[in-house]
């Protein structure tokens, strides 16, 4: 538990004796109060671990090839930063950092520390509150794909409407499908053949 992690450390010690190279996620380092939610957060973190290591190694390789001598930091769900090694151990804490980056960027670019921010993507739009320059955090329990978890996440309202959402039936039906990242190829404004929200905005 977050209050007494002794049993988790004992379990980790036993695992390390048997499987010294295994990636081990301790739930008290990720989740908050709530056994099931914290367990789900730990399982999700463990599932993302190998992919996170691969992505971070690719970042490091690309930076080295460019001759850039700088540390790598990744943004967390709460708008703060973490080192590459921390992100490799706790990838679940970067899970929703895309909308968070938009919100933090809105604070920096606008000069407002308190605001309502709308992040319009290709398929969806995320709406959230910026308080003191950081996204407001969701309540204790957050559903991720229908699974209850309790790691830090921004409190967002996701709407199935984005710049690439397809418009049909003379404008009476929008989405749910989208041209997504093919917006510059398929939208009418770019010479394509699909009517999208970007075309009528």
Predicted ranges, named:
Residues 1-201:
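N-terminally biased helix-coil "hinge/interface" segments that flank
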């Amino acid at each position: 538990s977050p209050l007494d992690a002794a049993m988790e450390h004992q379990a980790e010690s036993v695992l390390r004796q048997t499987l010294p190279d295994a990636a081990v996620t301790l739930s008290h380092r990720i989740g908050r109060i709530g056994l099931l939610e914290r367990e789900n957060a730990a399982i999700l973190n463990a599932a993302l671990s190998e992919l996170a290591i691969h992505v971070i190694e690719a970042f490091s390789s690309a930076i080295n090839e460019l001759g850039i001598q700088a540390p790598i930091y990744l943004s967390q769900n709460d708008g703060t930063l973490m080192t590459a090694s921390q992100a490799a151990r706790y990838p679940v804490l970067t899970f929703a950092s895309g909308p968070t980056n938009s919100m933090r960027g809105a604070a920096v670019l606008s000069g407002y520390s308190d605001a309502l921010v709308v992040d319009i993507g290709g398929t969806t739009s995320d709406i959230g509150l910026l308080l003191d320059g950081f996204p407001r955090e969701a309540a204790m329990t957050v559903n991720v794909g229908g699974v209850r978890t309790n790691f830090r996440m921004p409190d967002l309202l996701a709407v199935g409407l984005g710049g690439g959402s397809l418009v049909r039936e003379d404008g009476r039906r929008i989405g749910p499908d989208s041209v997504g990242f093919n917006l510059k190829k398929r939208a009418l404004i770019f010479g394509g053949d699909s009517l999208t929200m970007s075309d009528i905005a």
